[in-house]
């Protein structure tokens, strides 16, 4: 009877511990969100920085995919179109994101909060399971590390980088799996956990894989000399790592094959050492003092897991229950990560071979994990700690206090904030050390009371851990308070969705692109991801997975691109809008900026009837080309003869480039001299005046070079010719040189990191315009190619009407599991034609004419073309299909991985024994 009661109580205790390991981090964070007024408990959301500008847009688009409105494989809601899986695998692959179907669009901020809360709570639970499943029974003292890891400062700081928290959550199970394989107890946990880490985020998963290798080496070194299964362990680690990698191949293989040409390319920095003291400060409660800490690429990391776990971590190295070899191996593993974090080359390698842009040390949770994991080993055998063990944390605490209280006077005040001492943490730190010293002394003389004293300490330490972790998390939320987006701002963003839906109601989305001439209020850093936020076919976009060649081409066409994000901005020209099938524009007249297109007020644009009273206006372009059409066969790239200097670009002219696009597409729009007509014509200067000391030089091609001091000016007057009076005027500095300020008729023409590209100019009554270029710094033989052009929309109309005769009509979208297609029809009426789609060419794209596959290739620099040489005149069916070959390959590998996993469950141990037993027999 007593045994039954004892078993019942033990089971009840185990259940309580499991529940508490999940519930305590959950309740602490819920209470914190409540008192800090985080939505849905208040008016602030956890959205900040990239979540504002990127992730919220991707999540909204993903929701539309799950609702069946958009394709998972291909999207036209970024730049000129392209695969969606590169975005999905990097940002959205977590299975938790499927829960978005239970939230409305206006509840997505709450979705982010609750899924992050769930991941953090599961991180606490998984840490407890890691500790518990390596011994006979669980103890309440284990909750110290469950709470500490669940509320690790890394997770709270990076709440807005929601896709990284899956890695924090799953890491304890990866390590549990390795430990279980060591003992030949379980081969299932490791491959599933490793596979999940790579599936949910291949980026963070890769960091976990690197740590798994280091941990395997640590574990191997730590094995007792009498351990007979070393070779078994090596084979198991290799085989089940392979299986875990294969299971998740559908994500990381797909991502890898899409990475070529993106920002994810391999690039090592110059070898330098970072501030090591700043890195050590990451273990402190108050280490996060400014959003600027994470708006840097290196030198900062945060891995605070409560002040108490840090004490036990230090004591672990004095615990006699563990061999000296194991403790040294643990210490080396920990130091390796600290050293790697302080040296630029190894730091970059741990990030996959490319230094992160903002959000430094993205693997810092691994270091916090080690603090909790090795600290938990200490509490398992607390009584075996050397009585002098507390000296180390005592010295650490005292020396840290005096060092931080006497920081160099010359240290910047902002940097000093990161070393600010938390008095509460300091008190808890020394109280815990004092209690532990008392404990070690007491059990030395009264060992039989060890169990009861340890229980008493446990129920002191758990509340102190809650206080310490809670304060650390609260510090982060309070620092981020002004950065967090207000829910009302998000709701304001949501109101513009109805405007997009009005355009969509006019005709099928397949037939056009559209853009918004203003950014939603909730964007960050002027980044524009409106096409994905509102799920329309548009150009503006920013993600880390976009192809660099396509981004560069945005700038080439006269749009904005600064090396990071691309956007419609001032809209380039009416001709390029027509070329790219941009048929509709939405403007907010309450949002005034000079970085808006001027061509909307002239032909071929006209304002649609609008009954709104919210300042919104809708415009339609009557001269748009369809998404696909038959055209003259053209070269891979469009260049003018004077643009080349050997193999490099010397001089580039947006307007002449746009002329060449249309002349290449259609060769029968001719002038009286039987020459192809231009759409753009240069307006020649009336006069040029240089301020004192400015030197102007011309090279053999007529390109201008300037030398002069800062604040010097060059003034150029233009007279618009009479034939251009009713046409659009444009200005561009062809090299996008941001070393000068440009002012046209007292209007600032911004050419900066935030706004580049072609700018529209409003004509004056006098038709005289003055450009003033002011040097922002000293210039020495700097090439400046300013150009002032007008656009003859009558000639544009000729080109568009002629090309439209062979346009693809009645487009229909077909969505498959791994494919996406446009289907339509066109009428071929010329010889020597190609099919041309303003969709970027990439592997997996094919064009079919009347059901037959034709040779498909890259044309027009980045676009997709197919030869129509053997196609007869008349009506034809056309289909352009994108098949994600990376996804197909990844799914194939995942299937192999799942089969291998199933096979290993049944047969692995038998095969392993067979292999090693046969070797033993041969050896004998």
Where are these regions (language model features)?
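Membrane-embedded helix bundles of polyisoprenyl
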Residues: 22-25, 117-134, 139-222, 233-261, ...
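Active-site-proximal, structured, solvent-exposed surfaces of multi-pass membrane proteins
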Residues: 3, 10, 58, 673-924
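Start-transfer (signal-anchor) and selected internal transmembrane alpha helices
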Residues: 1-38, 232, 236, 451-461, ...
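Contiguous transmembrane helix-bundle modules in multi-pass membrane proteins
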Residues: 185, 204, 328-347, 354-492, ...
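Membrane-interface helix-loop junctions at the exits of transmembrane helices
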Residues: 30-38, 96, 102-106, 140-161, ...
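Membrane-interface coil-to-helix junctions
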Residues: 25-127, 147-168, 207, 252, ...
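Alpha-helical transmembrane segments at the extracellular/periplasmic loop-to-helix junctions
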Residues: 93-94, 276-319, 360-371, 422-436, ...
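Extracytoplasmic/lumenal acceptor-recognition loop(s) of multi-pass membrane glycoenzymes
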Residues: 78, 463-487, 504-579, 625, ...
């Amino acid at each position: 009877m007593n045994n039954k009661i004892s078993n019942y109580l033990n089971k009840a205790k185990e259940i309580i511990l499991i529940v508490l390991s999940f519930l305590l981090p959950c309740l602490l964070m819920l209470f914190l969100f409540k008192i800090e007024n985080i939505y849905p408990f208040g008016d602030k959301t956890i959205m900040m920085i990239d979540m504002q500008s990127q992730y919220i847009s991707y999540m909204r688009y993903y929701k539309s995919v799950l609702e069946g409105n958009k394709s998972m494989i291909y999207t036209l809601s970024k730049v000129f179109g392209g695969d969606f899986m590169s975005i999905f695998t990097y940002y959205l692959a977590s299975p938790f994101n499927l829960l978005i179907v239970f939230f409305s669009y206006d509840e997505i901020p709450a979705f982010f909060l609750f899924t992050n809360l769930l991941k953090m709570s599961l991180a606490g639970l998984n840490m407890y399971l890691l500790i518990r499943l390596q011994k006979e029974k669980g103890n309440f003292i284990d909750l110290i590390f469950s709470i500490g890891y669940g509320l690790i400062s890394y997770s709270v700081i990076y709440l807005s980088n929601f896709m990284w928290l899956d890695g924090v959550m799953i890491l304890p199970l990866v390590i549990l799996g390795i430990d279980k394989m060591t003992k030949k107890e379980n081969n299932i946990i490791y491959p599933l956990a490793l596979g999940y880490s790579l599936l949910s985020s291949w980026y963070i998963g890769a960091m976990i894989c690197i740590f798994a290798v280091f941990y395997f080496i640590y574990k191997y070194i730590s094995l007792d000399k009498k351990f007979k299964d070393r070779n078994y362990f090596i084979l198991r680690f290799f085989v089940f790592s392979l299986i875990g990698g294969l299971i998740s191949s559908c994500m990381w293989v797909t991502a890898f094959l899409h990475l070529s040409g993106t920002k994810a390319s391999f690039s090592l920095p110059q070898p330098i050492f970072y501030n090591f003291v700043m890195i050590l400060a990451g273990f402190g409660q108050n280490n996060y003092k400014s959003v600027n800490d994470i708006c840097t690429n290196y030198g900062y990391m945060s891995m605070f897991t409560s002040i108490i776990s840090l004490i036990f971590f230090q004591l672990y190295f004095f615990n006699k229950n563990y061999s000296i070899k194991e403790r040294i191996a643990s210490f080396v593993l920990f130091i390796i990560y600290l050293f790697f974090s302080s040296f630029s080359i190894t730091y970059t390698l741990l990030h996959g071979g490319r230094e992160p842009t903002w959000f430094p040390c993205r693997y810092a949770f691994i270091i916090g994990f080690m603090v909790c994991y090795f600290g938990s080993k200490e509490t398992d055998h607390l009584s075996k700690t050397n009585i002098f063990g507390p000296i180390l944390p005592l010295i650490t605490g005292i020396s840290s206090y005096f060092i931080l209280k006497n920081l160099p006077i010359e240290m910047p005040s902002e940097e000093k904030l990161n070393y600010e001492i938390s008095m509460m943490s300091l008190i808890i730190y020394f109280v815990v050390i004092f209690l532990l010293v008392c404990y070690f002394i007491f059990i030395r003389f009264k060992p039989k009371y060890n169990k009861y004293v340890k229980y008493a300490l446990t129920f002191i330490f758990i509340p102190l851990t809650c206080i310490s972790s809670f304060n650390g998390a609260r510090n982060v939320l309070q620092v981020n308070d002004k950065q967090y987006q207000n829910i009302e701002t998000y709701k304001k963003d949501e109101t513009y969705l109805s405007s997009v839906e009005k355009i969509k109601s006019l005709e099928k989305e397949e037939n056009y692109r559209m853009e918004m001439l203003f950014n939603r209020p909730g964007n960050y850093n002027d980044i524009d991801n409106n096409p994905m936020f509102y799920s329309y076919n548009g150009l503006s976009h920013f993600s880390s997975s976009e192809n660099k060649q396509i981004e560069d081409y945005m700038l080439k066409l006269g749009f904005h691109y600064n090396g990071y994000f691309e956007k419609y901005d001032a809209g380039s020209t009416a001709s390029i809008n027509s070329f790219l099938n941009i048929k509709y524009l939405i403007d907010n007249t309450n949002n005034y900026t000079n970085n808006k297109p001027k061509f909307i007020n002239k032909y071929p644009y006209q304002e649609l009837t609008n009954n709104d009273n919210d300042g919104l206006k809708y415009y339609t372009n009557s001269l748009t080309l369809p998404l696909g059409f038959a055209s003259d066969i053209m070269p891979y790239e469009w260049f003018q003869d004077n643009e080349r200097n050997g193999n490099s670009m010397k001089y580039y002219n947006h307007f002449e480039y746009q002329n060449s696009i249309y002349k290449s597409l259609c060769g029968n729009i001719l002038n009286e001299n039987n020459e192809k007509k231009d759409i753009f014509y240069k307006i020649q200067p009336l006069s040029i005046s240089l301020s004192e000391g400015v030197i102007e030089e011309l090279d053999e091609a007529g390109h201008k070079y300037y030398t002069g001091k800062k604040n010097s000016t060059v003034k150029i007057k233009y007279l618009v010719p009479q034939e251009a009076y009713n046409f659009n005027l444009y200005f561009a500095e062809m090299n996008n040189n941001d070393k000068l300020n440009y002012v046209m008729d007292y209007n600032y023409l911004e050419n900066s990191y935030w706004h580049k590209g072609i700018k529209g100019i409003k004509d004056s009554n006098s038709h005289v315009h003055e450009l003033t270029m002011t040097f922002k710094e000293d210039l020495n033989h700097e090439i400046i190619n300013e150009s002032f052009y007008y656009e003859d929309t009558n000639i544009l109309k000729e080109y568009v009407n002629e090309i439209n005769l062979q346009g693809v009509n009645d487009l229909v979208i077909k969505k498959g599991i791994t494919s996406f297609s446009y289907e339509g029809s066109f009428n071929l009426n010329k010889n020597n034609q190609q099919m041309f789609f303003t969709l970027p060419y990439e592997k997996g794209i094919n064009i079919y004419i009347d059901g037959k596959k034709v040779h498909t290739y890259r044309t027009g620099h980045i676009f997709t073309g197919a030869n129509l040489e053997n196609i007869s005149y008349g009506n034809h069916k056309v289909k352009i299909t994108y098949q994600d070959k990376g996804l197909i390959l990844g799914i194939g590998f995942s299937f192999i991985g799942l089969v291998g996993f199933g096979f290993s469950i049944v047969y692995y141990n038998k095969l392993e024994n067979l292999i090693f037993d046969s070797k033993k027999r041969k050896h004998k």
